[in-house]
From Swiss-Prot:
Family statement drawn from the similarity comment of this UniProt entry: Belongs to the RNA polymerase beta chain family.
Signal peptide: none
HAMAP family with a match to the protein in the record: RNApol_bact_RpoB
Gene Ontology CC terms, in alphabetical order: DNA-directed RNA polymerase complex
Stored Pfam families: RNA_pol_Rpb2_1, RNA_pol_Rpb2_2, RNA_pol_Rpb2_3, RNA_pol_Rpb2_45, RNA_pol_Rpb2_6, RNA_pol_Rpb2_7
Compositionally biased residues, Basic and acidic residues: 1184-1193
Keywords in alphabetical order: DNA-directed RNA polymerase, Nucleotidyltransferase, Transcription, Transferase
Name of protein: DNA-directed RNA polymerase subunit beta
Gene Ontology terms: biological process: DNA-templated transcription
Function as written in the Swiss-Prot or TrEMBL entry: DNA-dependent RNA polymerase catalyzes the transcription of DNA into RNA using the four ribonucleoside triphosphates as substrates.
Source organism: Bacillus pumilus (strain SAFR-032)
Cross-referenced InterPro entries: DNA-dir_RNA_pol_bsu_external_1 (IPR019462), DNA-dir_RNA_pol_su2 (IPR015712), DNA-dir_RNAP_su2_dom (IPR007120), DNA-dir_RNAP_su2_hyb_sf (IPR037033), RNA_pol_bsu_bac (IPR010243), RNA_pol_bsu_CS (IPR007121), RNA_pol_bsu_protrusion (IPR007644), RNA_pol_Rpb2_2 (IPR007642)
Amino acid sequence: MTGQLVQYGRHRQRRSYARISEVLELPNLIEIQTSSYQWFLDEGLREMFQDISPIEDFTGNLSLEFIDYSLGDPKYPVAESKERDVTYSAPLRVKVRLINKETGEVKDQDVFMGDFPIMTDTGTFIINGAERVIVSQLVRSPSVYFSGKVDKNGKKGFTATVIPNRGAWLEYETDAKDVVYVRIDRTRKLPVTVLLRALGFSSDQEILDLIGENEYLRNTLEKDNTENADKALLEIYERLRPGEPPTVENAKSLLDSRFFDPKRYDLANVGRYKINKKLHIKNRLFNQKLAETLVDPETGEILAEKGQILDRRVLDKVLPYLENGIGFRKLYPNGGVVEDEVELQSIKIYAPSDQEGEQVINVIGNAYVEEAVKNITPSDIIASISYFFNLLHGVGDTDDIDHLGNRRLRSVGELLQNQFRIGLSRMERVVRERMSIQDTNTITPQQLINIRPVIASIKEFFGSSQLSQFMDQTNPLAELTHKRRLSALGPGGLTRERAGMEVRDVHYSHYGRMCPIETPEGPNIGLINSLSSFAKVNRFGFIETPYRRVDPETGKVTPRIDYLTADEEDNYVVAQANALLADDGSFIDDNIIARFRGENTVVPRNRVDYMDVSPKQVVSAATACIPFLENDDSNRALMGANMQRQAVPLMQPESPIVGTGMEYVSGKDSGAAVICRYPGVVERVEAKNIWVRRYEDVDGQQVKGNLDKYSLLKFVRSNQGTCYNQRPIVSVGDEVVKGEILADGPSMEKGELALGRNVMVGFMTWDGYNYEDAIIMSERLVKDDVYTSIHIEEYESEARDTKLGPEEITRDIPNVGEDALRNLDERGIIRIGAEVKDGDLLVGKVTPKGVTELTAEERLLHAIFGEKAREVRDTSLRVPHGGGGIIHDVKVFNREDGDELPPGVNQLVRVYIVQKRKISEGDKMAGRHGNKGVISKILPEEDMPYLPDGTPIDIMLNPLGVPSRMNIGQVLELHMGMAARYLGIHIASPVFDGAREEDVWETLEEAGMSRDAKTVLYDGRTGEPFDNRVSVGIMYMIKLAHMVDDKLHARSTGPYSLVTQQPLGGKAQFGGQRFGEMEVWALEAYGAAYTLQEILTVKSDDVVGRVKTYEAIVKGDNVPEPGVPESFKVLIKELQSLGMDVKILSGDEEEIEMRDLEDDEETKKADGLALSNDEDAADLAPVDLERDAVTKE
């Protein structure tokens, strides 16, 4: 027997074919959400309050500071928040101090700053009762970027951009004449020397001394027509503020506020880190020839001679001295924006681009600006300009903006922080205004602060941001993937239209950080990705992946694990996880396949620095659930990963016989299961609750402590209308540990993800019914409820106050017989358990109609009988088309009972209808390898082909679906599944480290099957064997959310569009099928004149004709002649509105009168046919007409 037994949770053992031992546990898969939000509560909020404090008024004698904050307890627990349609949030209170500097008076006060949405334990938010997820955003990191460009004449040049977190951009570029230009904040370009002069390096000589003598700088100085700092400042001011009269003082303050004011310009922590890293001098000195002698400033010791090459060894020796002051220079700019001294680090080297090797260039670094400085400094600007000139001489590297070292994640915490900042800065403006208006002696912090803008900006973010999404809750895997999603779209990100091929493509730096497989098909491909299984996010927002450290001395793999970002990884050689290791951790082979900067190379074993942790660190959680992934083509694997998220939870879930071992972790971390919070023993188990007696440590002894109650969700509607149901899997007396699964969620079995069912599949054709990927299925799967799922739909009806009086929920509805009311209770609300069909009443409701001027008699009746004479119309809630089922639950909310309802609503009734959907023709099914198809025929069990032992198979798939798609994984799964079924075991075949072909054949032999895994099949109809042996086995098949019940649609009479009077389109509007231009040509080609005329008139927008036709059909008369279609009248009105006098003439030149809609007597009857734009009329249409037709008789 190959493989070894592995335990997954308490209830499942699998035979694992993995050869590589797991050295690292998978992290908690929703940590990206929870830890980011925790950071926001602990530090993010504090940062915001510190940034904005103190707020001072315009005179400077009042100052308001935010000292501390605290979050209270949520008003309702999670379940109740969902039920009441409120936001799950906690009150935020801030301690505010107001200081009056004139009197020295200090006032402290606790100020309520609104309710702040709280993240649930499972990484989601509940906003207005709906569960939402904040998706992490991939954006370009703030930094300085250099890139090469080639102009139209083929000349190579460069561009550079300094991108802040917020603030003005600075861009450098060269032109065809080798002049270096700068653009400030996307304005017109200026020679770069103008910017240097404006900073305070005013003379040509100063600039040449600073940057170093070279032809590019000479060209730029020639182009520059400013002589001193003042002229340069005026020049820049004219570019930034065209049309305003320039003065030197204004120009100074403008430039100062644009770049050196922390409120206007912010690099953030990550920007400062990236700029310091990029402008550090050492990267440009590596392997360059020195043009000066480096001397230790303290001892006078010579560290490196002039003319020496700075290789890795010399550079490592010089590095500590570089950081302690070699090459440091202090500059004293004058007359420009910068008043203080500027510290730089500069070292001279010979330009590698120069053939003679004589040209000396200056390499300038920014002299290690402190991390706390979040805005750009003059030394950053000079160093970036220097880097640009160095690039022109072949020193330095250009950047790849698609590299994950240059893209970072904004997770929940940071997105919230940015939103909160917007709210606070709006509030700051209000506070300043109020400070100057109100009396300074009596004022309190509470009176100054207006929390509206803060609350509004948070509400706006959760309610309408592109990154705040309605959670995909189809099944646990969909939930998990949604929380781990990375989007490049959204505010501050890319747009679909602008994103090119490069951004979407797989990049070598994605390895172990972003899944190369799981991404949507369609316009968002490559812009929305999924986090890899082992990846983490560091404090700067860069994605890190774990590697095993190789000891450089001994060459052995150590137990130490380092998390590396993409740009750190570029410095190391990394071996794959499948490199063979001896017992002591040394590499067995002399040459190892390894990666270095995106190249796969073979290196000697002593060159390896790190090794992969696991073969599945490349892929995401969903992709890691596909067994034999290594045998599938990537395009099909992408579909497989995406379709698992669309699996509908079944009534009887079953985990896969052939799994990957990832099912347990995915189920546990998704948030769908009930997880034990403390170790203990199970005391009581019910369908709805589990009680666990906690174990507590007292003086090293285990003592029984508190009793914890875990509530289970039973038959709740998920966001997608699937059934969310939890089932206990522990028994009384079980000892449980922290983190253990107590109850399965939807699509889970025995603690593992269970999206579909294991069914017996044969690869064969059958009378052409499985043409084009169609699926033939046995009726047994329908009878035994194998693929039956439960769907819950929610309908609501609200009684509002209208201008004519309040609406009323009642059983007393006009023109409705007692039979239709049989299932309503005395309140007029349907009873739980009733079975309803399309069009049945759910909630009886009447709305007052407009009362016209009453006659004297009516007024008398009104006076005698009171309100009764008032006209009401029926606006009851009815079951929509295709919505029939059983009433599962009814919830009633009343304003009188103190329920929070929207303004103007007095009563709200929610009705839940549950449907049990068996699988049927037209439903979509799929395997895990992207092999999807639609059920074309459900055969009786006796007609299905059967095995020699008489077992009929369950599903027939077309063998032609395999070769061209190249997803051979499904065939291996089929064979392995059959062997496992015979052996009575479950299998784990992890991705990239699963069962090899040889293992499959061995397992087949162990199970007593033939090595080709084929078998003779007999035709169920004739009993004859088929000519050839057929591959039959167990495959895991999933029923997808695309069900035929949701898609099938037919219209009788229904609503019409207001202007054209044509039927609406789409199932949701109960619309018709569009008969378009090309369809008209088809009927014309056949000469079907009457059919065509009918379709274009009485079946569409001949208003009078359609009423008469309906009437004729009801009475059994002949159908009348069609009239003029409404759209023709619209066309004429259109032409008349353009000032053309249009007349219609008959064949003998006589004008035809076209009566307008209003004055047409015939259309009075059409009121019943939903010609009004009142939606309720649509439902009543046929009834009214019949009544109308009867009265005419």
